[in-house]
From Swiss-Prot:
This is E3 ubiquitin-protein ligase BRE1. E3 ubiquitin-protein ligase that mediates monoubiquitination of histone H2B to form H2BK123ub1. H2BK123ub1 gives a specific tag for epigenetic transcriptional activation and is also a prerequisite for H3K4me and H3K79me formation. Residues 176-225, 273-293 are annotated as: Disordered. InterPro entries: E3_ubiquit_lig_Bre1, Znf_C3HC4_RING-type, Znf_RING, Znf_RING/FYVE/PHD. A zinc finger (RING-type) spans 611-650. It is found in: Nucleus. CDD domains: RING-HC_Bre1-like (cd16499). The gene is BRE1. GO terms for biological process: chromatin organization; protein ubiquitination. Keywords: Chromatin regulator, Coiled coil, Metal-binding, Nucleus, Transferase, Ubl conjugation pathway, Zinc, Zinc-finger. One of its GO terms (cellular component) is HULC complex. It comes from Kluyveromyces lactis (strain ATCC 8585 / CBS 2359 / DSM 70799 / NBRC 1267 / NRRL Y-1140 / WM37). Pathway: Protein modification; protein ubiquitination. Signal peptide: none annotated.
Length: 663
């Protein structure tokens, strides 16, 4: 703590043999202000250090809280699926979906017991035992918190006490205080002798002016006062020693009682711990046996499911092979029948084309023969008509030769011949046209006959094709029936395959669930063992901390007892010193020492110590504006009466300018 103090300024004080001056009073006030500033500076440094420690602890606690929250969220995710109650499911879903860490920590802190119960329910462990353990741990934590609070309070009291002691040491080390009280640390006895010698010299000087009787009376009074003071000192020392002896005996008896109580509690705690360990071992052993039995039964079920799965796989493979063989047979038979039908159809088509060509050839020959027959008949008719006309011409020529004289008739005959030729020419033309028409008609009839033959052939081929189509439709219906039957068989096989697949997937899911349950049980066992180890370690750590706290508590109690004893001793010494001062003051007043140097020094002491306004209370508040010191009662009264000016220098001040000091 001395590192935080500022270097003390060097004060220029008057000679201790001389009475106090105004400079000594100002130096005394300045040093009091300096001590107060040092005190507040030390407190500020302590607060800064505590703030740093608390910030580091807060960061660690936030990290640990975030880790605990993440682990709780992971546990909640693993527990949600196995939870049956809808409210618990909603609560766990809300816990999983919350992203803000502050709200998550609030939810977990408000519902810690509920979360523990849910995790323990789903884990399948014994809830009552775990809740009992949690309650024991919570009670232990509460007791530890109470112990920590009490130890912190005691530590605060101890720090305050030590700060007061340091302030006393600072006051003892200060030159101004030693100058005021005439008690310097280095040579107190010498100063007392000097004071006594100076006082005696002053008294002698003054008494030299007076009569010898007054000097003898003064010396006798002073010696009597010194004798009484020594007796009072011895009495105070005796009372202090008696009080210390009483305190020590009481403290000894109290410590013996506490020791016996602690031994009894330690023995009871040991027995309780041994019983708890036996109970925990007896509980863990059946739990381990139950888990082993569960694992063995689950492994057997897993093996049985694997065997069933293998049987289903072999059946599935056989069915798939039979299906492939059946499909191959059907396809081969269908292809063979289709190829034979195609070949038969092609041969029939070839025969039909061949028959049609032969038929066309025969029909053409018949039509040609018929056409040739008609032309020969027409030629014969024409020849007959020509022969008839030639015969008629010959008859006419014979007639003309017989009748030569008939020229006129000849001309008429020639004209008739011309007309006949023209008529014959026209008839020939008509006959040629008629022949052409007949040829066209014959051709058309031939074509008609061909077309009719083709039609009849087509009809015959149509009938054959219809018969073939009927046969093919019958074959197609049979093949369709076969295909439908095959499709039905395929559907049944597919349903069987789907059922086999479903059974296979169910068996695989069951196997996965069994494996996951095995993993979860193993993980839970590992977690429980780790938690058990952690709890054991935490209990050991808490026990060690409690031991350390008990040790520190006993040390602090012993220190507090020592300081109480010292305080009582100091109180007794202060009371004796006050009695001494009162007696000395009375002796001085009775000996007429008001005009002396000692009386003046005491008056200066009173002006330094007591308030100049009321002269009743000690000076304990300084004004920051001017540095003058008064009692807090007078300052508050002046502020209440709106007299907000210093009574010595008339400088204004407010309630914020008041500074508490210790002279």
């Amino acid at each position: 703590m001395n590192d935080h103090f500022v270097k003390r300024p060097k004060l220029e004080l008057s000679d201790p043999s001389e009475p106090l001056t105004q400079k000594d009073v100002i130096a005394f006030q300045k040093e009091a202000l300096f001590r107060c500033l040092n005190k507040w500076r030390v407190k500020a440094n302590q607060l800064v250090e505590e703030n740093e420690v608390l910030a580091a602890g807060l960061s660690k606690t936030t990290e640990s809280v975030s880790g605990c929250c993440s682990s709780i969220v992971v546990l909640a995710r693993s527990v949600v699926e196995d939870c049956s109650d809808e409210q618990d499911k909603r609560f766990l879903q809300q816990l999983i979906n919350t992203e803000d860490e502050h709200t998550l920590t609030q939810i977990i802190s408000n519902n810690s017991a509920r979360i523990c119960e849910l995790i323990l329910k789903t884990s399948g462990s014994n809830i009552s035992d775990n809740i009992g353990r949690l309650q024991e741990l919570e009670s232990l934590t509460l007791t530890l918190q109470k112990l920590l609070k009490s130890s912190e309070n005691k530590l605060k009291k101890a720090t305050e006490y030590y700060e007061n002691i340091i302030a006393q040491y600072d006051r003892q080390d200060s030159e101004s205080v030693s100058r005021v009280f005439n008690t310097a640390d280095d040579d107190s006895n010498v100063k007392k002798e000097k004071q006594s010698s100076t006082g005696a010299s002053s008294v002698n000087d003054e008494s030299n002016d007076n009569s010898d009787k007054s000097q003898s009376n003064k010396e006798s009074a002073v010696s009597q006062a010194h004798h009484e003071i020594e007796i009072n000192d011895l009495n105070t020392q005796i009372s202090v020693l008696e009080a210390t002896v009483k305190e020590l005996t009481e403290w000894k008896n109290q410590n013996e009682r506490e020791l016996s109580e602690l031994r009894q509690t330690v023995a009871s705690n040991k027995s309780a711990l041994s019983n708890n360990q036996l109970q925990s071992n007896s509980q863990h052993q059946p739990d381990a046996s139950v888990t082993n039995e569960k694992i063995s039964s689950l492994t057997k079920q897993n093996e049985q499911l694997q065997q069933i799965n293998e049987g289903y796989l072999t059946k599935f493979q056989q069915l798939s092979a039979d299906r492939e063989i059946f499909n191959n047979k059907l396809t081969s038979e269908f292809n063979l029948a289709q190829e034979t039908l195609k070949k038969h159809n092609a041969s029939l088509e070839k025969d039909l084309v061949r028959i049609r060509t032969i038929r066309d050839e025969l029909l053409a020959k018949v039509s040609l023969l018929e056409a040739q027959k008609t032309k020969s008949e027409m030629l014969e008719d024409l020849e007959k008509s020509l022969n008839i006309q030639q015969e008629q011409l010959q008859k006419f020529e014979s007639r003309s030769s017989e009748n030569a004289s008939q020229d006129a008739l000849m001309k008429e005959l020639q004209d008739l011949e011309k007309a006949f030729r023209e008529v014959s020419h026209l008839s020939n033309k008509k006959y040629a046209a008629y022949l052409n028409q007949e040829s066209v008609l014959s051709k058309l009839t031939v074509e008609k006959t061909k077309a009719s033959e083709k039609y009849f052939a087509a009809m015959r081929s149509k009938d054959a094709i219809m018969i073939e189509n009927k046969n093919l439709s019958k074959n197609l219906n049979k093949s369709n029936e076969l295909i439908v039957q095959l499709k039905d068989l395929e559907k049944t096989l597919q349903q069987k395959i789907v059922n086999v697949h479903m059974q296979l997937s169910l068996s695989q899911e069951n196997e996965k669930r069994v494996k996951e349950s095995n993993k979860e049980t193993s993980m839970k066992i590992v977690e429980l063992t780790s938690e058990n180890n952690k709890l054991k370690k935490s209990t050991e750590r808490l026990e060690s901390e409690t031991r350390n706290l008990i040790g520190t508590k006993t040390e602090l109690e012993s220190k507090i007892k020592d300081k109480d004893i010292e305080n009582k001793q100091l109180k007794i010494k202060v009371s004796s010193a006050e009695a001494k001062s009162k007696k000395l003051y009375k002796t001085l007043l009775s000996n007429g020492g008001d005009n002396g140097a000692l009386a003046e020094e005491l008056e200066n002491f009173r002006t330094i110590i007591y308030c100049s306004l009321c002269s009743k209370n000690w000076k304990n508040t300084a004004l920051k504006t001017c540095g003058h010191v008064f009692c807090d009662v007078c300052c508050k009264e002046r502020l209440a009466a709106r007299m907000r000016k210093c009574p010595t220098c008339n400088k204004p001040f407010s309630s914020n300018d008041l500074l508490s000091i210790h002279l």
